[in-house]
């Protein structure tokens, strides 16, 4: 049997993934910061999922963006349904820690969200983000429309040029469409840094400006 450490740098194969459960984890459906629902139909609003390391700090980055209606943290991109935090940390689910961002396209452009995403972490680090090591910390953009997907790819290429000029390696961000199922994380993790203002935040960018979303 493989140890947990074996899954820090590679995704589990189908037979290695934990089975998970049919029932979703309990969720208090109110955003602690803005009072909006975390789960719903969100008619007339757009959605995207971002993975950029530990989701505690990542979520705060996006709930502070004007035009974002709500945010929630969860697990996405893997195989285990309704995984728990401890299961995700084992590396045996294949999920990355993700932030669901629900936004009003009339108030904030997708390009602006992409700029926040790229500048808030180092997308060249593969299966880690800073001191946080494991497949659950990989960089990811999970798109809900073809237009989002095309924009995400174009933004990656534009930002790669800036990173290369500054001495960074290749972007390893996983960009997918359609977006995989987003499994909401436990209540304790929702808006974590609003509940614990001095809590851990390992998020750190490269300092390289992303040349998109400036005039959007």
Swiss-Prot record:
GO terms for cellular component: cytoplasm
InterPro entries: Met_Sox_Rdtase_MsrA_dom (IPR002569), Met_Sox_Rdtase_MsrA_sf (IPR036509), MsrA_MetSO_reductase (IPR050162)
GO biological process: cellular response to oxidative stress; protein modification process
Known EC number: 1.8.4.11
Reaction equation(s) it catalyzes: L-methionyl-[protein] + [thioredoxin]-disulfide + H2O = L-methionyl-(S)-S-oxide-[protein] + [thioredoxin]-dithiol; [thioredoxin]-disulfide + L-methionine + H2O = L-methionine (S)-S-oxide + [thioredoxin]-dithiol
Pfam families: PMSR (PF01625)
GO terms, molecular function: L-methionine-(S)-S-oxide reductase activity; peptide-methionine (S)-S-oxide reductase activity
Catalytic-site annotation from UniProt: 54
HAMAP family reported in the protein's UniProt record: MsrA (MF_01401)
Purpose of the protein: Has an important function as a repair enzyme for proteins that have been inactivated by oxidation. Catalyzes the reversible oxidation-reduction of methionine sulfoxide in proteins to methionine.
Family: Belongs to the MsrA Met sulfoxide reductase family.
Protein's recorded name: Peptide methionine sulfoxide reductase MsrA
Protein's gene: msrA
